[in-house]
Design a protein with these regions (language model features):
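Alpha-helical transmembrane segments of polytopic integral membrane proteins
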Residues: 19, 23-26, 77-84, 113, ...
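Hydrophobic alpha-helical transmembrane segments of integral membrane proteins
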Residues: 93-127
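Alpha-helical transmembrane segments of multi-pass integral membrane proteins
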Residues: 113-171
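Alpha-helical transmembrane segments of integral membrane proteins, especially early/N-terminal helices
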Residues: 22-44, 70-74, 104-111, 166-171
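Membrane-helix boundary elements
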Residues: 51-76
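Cytoplasmic juxtamembrane regions at transmembrane-helix boundaries
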Residues: 2-9, 80-106
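Alpha-helical transmembrane segments and their helix-start/interface "positive-inside/aromatic belt" motifs
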Residues: 4-25
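Perimembrane loop-to-helix junctions flanking transmembrane segments
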Residues: 37-59
């Protein structure tokens, strides 16, 4: 009973994260579109993020940096959505099933892609930022560690499914 209550709370927080990340991605995209007509908007793109220097330097670089951020937050929202789906499909009477394993692998891949996007974003921002002494807004790149851990758990669940099916066959 306690586990099911915790899972419901986790599902609520996953929905909360999903909605929040989608709002964040949408807000950045909308302010980017506004900054095309009014460069001053880039001074406070989202929550104090000032990319005005990048916009005045090169609209192309500015666009890439903003799109990295939109894609990154969208992928994070997608991962939160996968967690919601995982929690929906999770059956505590038979926790080792192919749905759980597939969702865990998808989450692991999503986090790995997130890590790649963060590295590309950070490299791009550092190349320009250091060269022209611009303020840099970097993403954490600790995603690969999390991706590996979730992938390992997915493999454990897969092994649990194999053992469970072997036991079902022997009964």
């Amino acid at each position: 009973m306690k586990t099911e209550k915790i899972l419901k709370i986790m599902k609520f927080f996953s929905w909360f994260a999903f909605i929040g990340l989608m709002i964040k991605a949408g807000a950045i995209l909308v302010t980017y579109l506004l900054s095309i007509n009014d460069a001053e908007v880039a001074k406070n793109l989202y929550e104090g993020m000032n990319l005005y220097q990048y916009l005045t330097f090169s609209f192309t670089h500015y666009t890439f940096l903003v799109m990295y951020k939109v894609i990154l937050f969208s992928v994070e929202a997608y991962i939160a959505y996968l967690v919601i789906q995982l929690l929906k499909k999770l059956d505590m009477s038979q926790p080792f099933n192919t749905h759980v394993q597939q969702f865990m692998q998808q989450i692991s891949k999503g986090i790995f892609y997130l890590w790649i996007i963060a590295i590309v974003h950070n490299t791009h921002m550092q190349l320009i930022g250091k060269k022209y002494d611009f303020e840099m807004y970097l993403f954490s790149s600790d995603f690969v560690f999390l991706s590996v851990i979730i992938f390992i758990f997915a493999q454990i669940v897969k092994r649990g499914i194999d053992i469970q099916s072997e036991n079902d066959l022997t009964i």
